[in-house]
Structures are given as C-alpha cells and as structure tokens.
C-alpha cells in the first residue's frame, strides 16, 4: 500500500536517528585517542585525520543507507541499480588514483565521493517518492 503519511513519518523519525548517530560518531572521534590507547595501546599510531575520514565515511554511508532502505521498501530500485553499477565502475580507478597521491586517505576519500553520489541521487529519489512527484526512472 502507498501510505505516504506513514512513510513520511518513518522517514522523519529515521532522520532523527541519523542526527543522533552523527553526534555519536563525532563524540567517538574526539574520544578516539583514549579509545585507541585502551584498545591497542602504543603498538600502532592511528593519525587523527584517518579517524576523521572514517567518521565522515560512516556518516555519509548511514545517510545513504537510510534512503536506500525506504527506496527498497517501495520497490523503486531501477535507478539505484544504475547508480550503484556506475559507482562500482568508478570506485576502483578513483581509489587507485587518489590512493597513489594521498595513500590510505585517498581510498577512504574515494569511498566518500562515491557514497556522496549515491546519497545525492537516493535522497532526491526518496523525496520525490514521498512527495508523490516521482515519475519515470525516479519511481521505477
């Protein structure tokens, strides 16, 4: 059934959970030096910028997942299939390119870029669906 009032309500609630997650990830980033010390001691030095980049990826990926869950629930997965296939083709060359110049941060940056592309398309798609303005590829 197409209960858009209920779906909008769920989307809003899930968005609040996402905001809480952003706060939790941010707190974890600031606590990371202490947590790393407890977890692995002085065996490995993890750069703070690496922690921040992983946190950024986590936040982007969680936002992306929120959109995808609802899109999958509605069954409008054609656009998702195309966008993810393009992302898969672009991810490895982009990771290799950025990894060559920036190292491990380049690979994480590549993941962030690809997931930002996903998130952009999927956020537009779910908002079109929930506002009942989706047509063409946006609703298939």
Which stretches of residues belong to each language-model region?
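Serine/threonine-rich low-complexity intrinsically disordered regions
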Residues: 1, 45-47, 102, 125, ...
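Specific pore-lining/lateral-gate transmembrane helices of multi-pass inner-membrane transport
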Residues: 1-42, 46, 55, 63, ...
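Interhelical loop/hinge segments that connect adjacent transmembrane helices in multipass membrane
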Residues: 2-5, 128-140
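Short runs within selected transmembrane alpha-helices of multi-pass transporters and secretion channels
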Residues: 25-26, 30, 49-75, 79-99, ...
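Membrane-interfacial segments
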Residues: 35, 39-43, 102, 106, ...
């Amino acid at each position: 059934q197409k209960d858009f009032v209920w779906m909008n309500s769920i989307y809003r609630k899930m968005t609040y959970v996402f905001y809480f997650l952003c706060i939790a990830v941010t707190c974890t980033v600031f606590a990371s030096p202490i947590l790393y010390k407890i977890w692995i001691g002085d065996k490995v030095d993890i750069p703070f910028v690496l922690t921040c980049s992983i946190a950024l990826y986590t936040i982007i990926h969680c936002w992306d997942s929120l959109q995808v869950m609802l899109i999958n629930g509605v069954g409008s997965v054609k656009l998702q299939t195309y966008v993810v296939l393009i992302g898969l083709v672009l991810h490895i060359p982009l990771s290799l390119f950025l990894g060559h110049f920036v190292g491990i941060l380049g690979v994480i940056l590549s993941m962030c870029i690809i997931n930002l592309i996903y998130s952009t398309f999927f956020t537009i798609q779910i908002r079109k669906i929930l506002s009942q303005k989706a047509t063409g590829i946006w609703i298939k």
